[in-house]
C-alpha cells in the first residue's frame, strides 16, 4: 500500500480498522426499519467531514459544517487520533495538522441515502438564514438535465441507494444542511436484505472530479470502494480500496 504523504501504512491501516470495527458494530446492532443517511462535506484544504445518521423509521439531520479549526483546537498533531475518528474528520491530503488551513471552507456536499428513506426536503442555508437558490443547485447536479432528481445507485439492476451531490458558492464559509424523510415501508423493511447502507457503498462508483477558480488546490480523483465495503477517496493519485471496475 503506497503512503499518502505524511501518513504511514500503520497509521492508515489503524484508522481503517477502527472505522471498520465501528461500522460493523453499528451494522450488526441495527434493527429492522433502520434508515441510513451519510453526508460527506469536502473542504478547501482537502479535509473530508463524514457524518452518518441512523434512526428507526424516520431520520432528521440538522448539522452545521463550520471551519474545521473548531475541531482542531487543543488536539495533537497525530494525523488520525481517536478524537478525529470519533468526529469523522479526515485529512486525505496528508493528515498533517500543520497543513490545515484555518480559512478552510466547504466546497461540496454529497448525500448518500438508502432507498428506505423517502426524502421530503433538503435545505441548505448560508449561515442560518439565506437559502442556496434552487437554480444553482440544479446547475450543480450533472444528472438534473435528465430529469432525475437524485442519482440512482444500482446493484444487479436493483436500486440500492440514491446520491445527491452539489457544489457550493465560493462565498460560503459555513453551511447548514437539513434532511428529513420517513421510512417507505417499515413493516417489511429488513436491514439484512440488499437494501442496506453497506450495499449502497458497494454499489456507488461516483466521479467526484471538480476543480474551479475558487478551489484550485484539491481535486477529488475518484470514489473507491474498499474490500470491507468502506468508501475511500483516491486523492492525488494515491489509490486505496478496490475500484468497482476491478471487483470480481
From Swiss-Prot:
<feature type="glycosylation site" description="N-linked (GlcNAc...) asparagine; by host">
    <location>
        <position position="86"/>
    </location>
</feature>
<protein>
    <recommendedName>
        <fullName>Polyhedrin</fullName>
    </recommendedName>
</protein>
<feature type="glycosylation site" description="N-linked (GlcNAc...) asparagine; by host">
    <location>
        <position position="237"/>
    </location>
</feature>
<feature type="glycosylation site" description="N-linked (GlcNAc...) asparagine; by host">
    <location>
        <position position="28"/>
    </location>
</feature>
<keyword id="KW-1035">Host cytoplasm</keyword>
<dbReference type="Pfam" id="PF05865">
    <property type="entry name" value="Cypo_polyhedrin"/>
</dbReference>
<dbReference type="InterPro" id="IPR008464">
    <property type="entry name" value="Cypo_polyhedrin_Cypovirus1"/>
</dbReference>
<comment type="function">
    <text>Major component of the virus occlusion bodies, which are large proteinaceous structures (polyhedra), that protect the virus from the outside environment for extended periods until they are ingested by insect larvae.</text>
</comment>
<dbReference type="GO" id="GO:0030430">
    <property type="term" value="C:host cell cytoplasm"/>
</dbReference>
<keyword id="KW-0732">Signal</keyword>
<keyword id="KW-0325">Glycoprotein</keyword>
<dbReference type="GO" id="GO:0039679">
    <property type="term" value="C:viral occlusion body"/>
</dbReference>
<keyword id="KW-0842">Viral occlusion body</keyword>
<feature type="glycosylation site" description="N-linked (GlcNAc...) asparagine; by host">
    <location>
        <position position="77"/>
    </location>
</feature>
<keyword id="KW-0426">Late protein</keyword>
<feature type="signal peptide">
    <location>
        <begin position="1"/>
        <end position="27"/>
    </location>
</feature>
Amino acid at each position: 500500500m503506497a503512503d499518502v504523504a505524511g501518513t504511514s501504512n500503520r497509521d492508515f491501516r489503524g484508522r481503517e480498522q477502527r472505522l471498520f470495527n465501528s461500522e460493523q458494530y453499528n451494522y450488526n446492532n441495527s434493527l429492522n426499519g433502520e434508515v441510513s443517511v451519510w453526508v460527506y462535506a469536502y473542504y478547501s484544504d482537502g479535509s473530508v467531514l463524514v457524518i452518518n445518521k441512523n434512526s428507526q423509521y424516520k431520520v432528521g439531520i440538522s448539522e452545521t459544517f463550520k471551519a474545521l479549526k473548531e475541531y482542531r483546537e487543543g488536539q495533537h498533531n497525530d494525523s488520525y487520533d481517536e478524537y478525529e475518528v470519533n468526529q469523522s474528520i479526515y485529512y486525505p491530503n496528508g493528515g498533517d495538522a500543520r497543513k490545515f488551513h484555518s480559512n478552510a471552507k466547504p466546497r461540496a456536499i454529497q448525500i448518500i441515502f438508502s432507498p428506505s428513506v423517502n426524502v421530503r426536503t433538503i435545505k441548505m442555508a448560508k449561515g442560518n438564514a439565506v437559502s442556496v437558490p434552487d437554480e444553482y443547485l440544479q446547475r450543480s447536479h450533472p444528472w438534473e438535465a435528465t430529469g432525475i432528481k437524485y442519482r440512482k445507485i444500482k446493484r444487479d439492476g436493483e436500486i440500492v441507494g440514491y446520491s445527491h451531490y452539489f457544489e457550493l458558492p465560493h462565498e460560503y464559509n459555513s453551511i447548514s444542511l437539513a434532511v428529513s424523510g420517513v421510512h417507505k415501508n417499515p413493516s417489511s423493511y429488513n436491514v439484512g436484505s440488499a437494501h442496506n447502507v453497506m450495499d449502497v457503498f458497494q454499489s456507488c462508483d461516483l466521479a467526484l472530479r471538480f476543480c474551479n477558480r475558487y478551489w484550485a488546490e484539491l481535486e477529488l480523483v475518484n470514489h473507491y470502494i474498499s474490500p470491507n465495503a468502506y468508501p475511500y477517496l483516491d486523492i492525488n493519485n494515491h489509490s486505496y480500496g478496490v475500484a468497482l471496475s476491478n471487483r470480481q
